[in-house]
Amino acid sequence: MKFVLVLFILILYIKPTKANEKDHELLMATLFVQSSAEFYANSKSLYSSAQQNLLDVLENKNHTAALEQMGNFQDKPPAIILDVDQTVLDNSAYQARLIKNNSSYPNGWVSWAKEEKAEFLPGALEFIKFAQSKGVEIFFVTNRVIEIENATLSNYEKLGLKLSSRVDHILSRGENGWDSNKTSRRELVAKDYRILMMFGDNLGDFVDIKDNLLTPQKRVEITKNMMIFGVFLGLCFQTQCMEHGRELLSILIIQFLEIKN
């Protein structure tokens, strides 16, 4: 019932008004993210739910959230993988800038990231710090380009998140030859860590991106064993519509109904 409510709220907020030359496709969704109590409460609730489940999956040595996790992983140190944009960091201020300038992504994206002004989504920082306090290593698998990796790290530090320098916590697109497919980066983490949870706002944050092209039944099958798959759905409904609008929402509704059925 919770996800149905979230879905309804987003349909309400992104329903188009009468077209005129001043309309901007990002306007309603950006306003929703920046000012809605429902958005705040849902994001907070999603991360709070993950925090409540963390100790259970930490104690269960046979649990892994990653399809890439093979072999004897039970005694590996624990880790969590998170996407960055609109999963951990809120870029609605950048979206608002696009609206003001009557522009579109990727115009100004790198410059925005280098300003290091993004805020954490509600609940994200508290969850990450809680996981760190339990000895869980944090990895950000992102399609931000390597050019802005240091800015991303600095942005985190300004917001109070400290990451040790002994491992590479931010695995960026373009680093070590990585393209936008995140599979090889998840495999890299899985070599040395047991992956407890994964967070993202796109199916490619969890499975090989080419699996997005599979049949609806296959997509359901490959996601059955994903821990905290509800976090994926919730963050999709909250944030992806801000970036991609009504067409993507229709896709997400279909995926939501497939999984529920």
Predicted regions, residues:
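Non-catalytic pre-domain segments flanking phosphatase-related domains
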Residues: 16-82, 251-261
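C-terminal cap/substrate-recognition subdomain and adjoining C-terminal extension
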Residues: 48, 149-261
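Active-site neighborhood of HAD-like aspartate-dependent phosphohydrolases
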Residues: 77, 88-119, 133
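Structural recognition of the beta-strand scaffold that forms the well-ordered cores
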Residues: 79-83, 89, 137-142, 169-172, ...
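Surface-exposed patches in mature extracellular/periplasmic domains of secreted proteins
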Residues: 58-70, 138-143, 165-168
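Sec-dependent N-terminal signal peptides
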Residues: 4-12
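Second-shell loop/turn segments in exported
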Residues: 32-41, 110-117, 139-145, 174-175
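Substrate-recognition element of Asp-dependent hydrolases with the DxDx(T/V) motif
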Residues: 86, 124-157, 201-203
